[in-house]
């Protein structure tokens, strides 16, 4: 008896999966439900629900299929909750860490300074990003992929990180120190109140860098991952009348998703640099820059 974890990059592909549990199987405004349980919280009216990593109602499975739309710390946490062999990660000893994962999922990594997290949990978070998140392959956009091995790898790594493994924690500390280099490497140009950044899979996430290396702060970021063909826009702080999710869905349809403060292009589509520039222009115009 085994639990199989599957990644579906689009709603159409996800609809063909007979899943017992779905973990953030959210594709813009489309939510794929599991026959046993659905863990989702990114839809309007669902913001009060816990992120999967903090959802104690997710049942444990002896066998079955778990479906996800993407893999990040919060989604991994939800997947691991379905496995009794990783129940020690959720016994309450590491609640601060999981609260931080929830915070990042809802608010974005750029808000880490407002999370109230301890230095220890911040190092643990960066350790996960450095050792697991950044090592994930780029999954195909046109088919469902078995990710069971990756879930177990993440669980084993988290167990080491949370138990204080020096090698893992050192990688997290080094990642935090890398921020200045990342700022310089991803900077493209300024458009009004928006910083345009270009990254790739190796360089990594950069939507938390609202201040340039010269110390100038901006209201928003538009970032383009040229390997993934993905666009992510985000706001440093809430702006009346500006919703990142609405902008992305207006431009690319309902499968673009996220929150008012941070949102991305449809997971199954490869976006061009021209589309990235147009998105940045739309964001800048709406802000008024």
Where are these regions (language model features)?
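Catalytic core of tubulin tyrosine ligase-like
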Residues: 156-163
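Oxyanion-binding "anion nests"
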Residues: 164-194
């Amino acid at each position: 008896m085994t639990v199989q974890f599957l990644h579906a990059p689009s709603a159409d592909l996800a609809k063909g999966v007979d899943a017992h549990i779905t973990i953030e199987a959210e594709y813009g405004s489309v939510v794929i439900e599991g026959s046993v349980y659905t863990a989702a919280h990114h839809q309007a009216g669902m913001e009060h629900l816990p992120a999967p990593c903090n959802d104690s109602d997710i049942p444990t499975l002896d066998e079955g299929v778990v479906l996800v739309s993407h893999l990040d710390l919060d989604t991994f946490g939800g997947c691991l909750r379905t496995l009794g062999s990783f129940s020690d990660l959720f016994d309450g000893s590491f609640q601060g860490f999981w609260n931080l994962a929830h915070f990042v999922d809802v608010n974005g990594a750029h808000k880490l300074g407002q999370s109230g997290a301890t230095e220890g949990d911040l190092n643990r978070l960066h350790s996960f990003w450095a050792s697991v998140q950044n090592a994930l392959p780029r999954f195909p956009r046109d088919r469902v992929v078995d990710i069971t091995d990756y879930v177990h790898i993440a669980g084993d790594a988290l167990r080491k990180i949370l138990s204080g493994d020096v090698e893992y924690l050192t990688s997290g500390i080094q990642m935090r120190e890398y921020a200045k280099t990342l700022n310089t490497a991803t900077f493209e140009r300024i458009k009004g109140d928006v910083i345009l950044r270009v990254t790739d899979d190796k360089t990594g996430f950069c939507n938390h860098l609202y201040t340039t290396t010269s110390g100038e702060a901006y209201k928003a970021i538009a970032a383009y991952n040229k390997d993934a063909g993905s666009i992510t826009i985000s706001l440093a702080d809430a702006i009346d009348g500006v919703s990142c999710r609405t902008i992305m869905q207006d431009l690319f349809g309902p499968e673009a998703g996220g929150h008012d403060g941070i949102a991305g292009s449809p997971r199954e589509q490869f976006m061009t640099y021209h589309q990235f520039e147009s998105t940045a222009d739309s964001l800048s115009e709406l802000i008024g820059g």
